[in-house]
Amino acid sequence: GERGPSRRPEPPTRAPDKAVDVPVREDQALLYRLSGDWNPLHADPEFAATAGFDRPILHGLCSYGATLKAVTDTLLGGDVARIRSYATRFAGVVYPGETLRVRMWADGDGGGAGSGRIVAAVSAVERDEAPVLADTVIEHT
């Protein structure tokens, strides 16, 4: 049948409730390799250039995890048990040494003790706020 309409979670038009800058270490992609991902795109400058990048890029799951940690620490009191779901769309790359800007909008109880949802947008500060993660939603208790 026909595909149904897509509902992308757009960030509200108001200013974010919170914003946090998360520095990414220069050696972060090399450290992240300890998780077992040996893709040379994250460590080999020549391979990265062949793939069309200026230099090796950070693992997407690393930026994904750093974002969830920033949201959890900022709006959920660091309590990971409150997270019910986390969804996002990878919108761009992160280079080691850059800074992630995580902007957050809280619905429901505003990130307090009750349940609700947080919409986030993540960008790379050093590249004129280039999008990194989009359509990001964290459902929480």
Report each predicted region and the residues it spans.
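Catalytic strand-loop segment that frames the active site of acyl-thioester-processing enzymes
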Residues: 1-58, 72, 76
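HotDog/MaoC-like acyl-thioester-processing domains
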Residues: 1-20, 96, 101-141
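A broadly conserved detector of short glycine/acidic/proline-rich loop/turn motifs that flank catalytic sites
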Residues: 24-26, 35, 92-94, 106, ...
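Terminal targeting signals and extreme-terminal segments of soluble enzymes
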Residues: 53-55, 61, 66, 110-111
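Hydrophobic beta-strand-centered segment that forms part of the acyl-chain substrate-binding groove
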Residues: 63-101
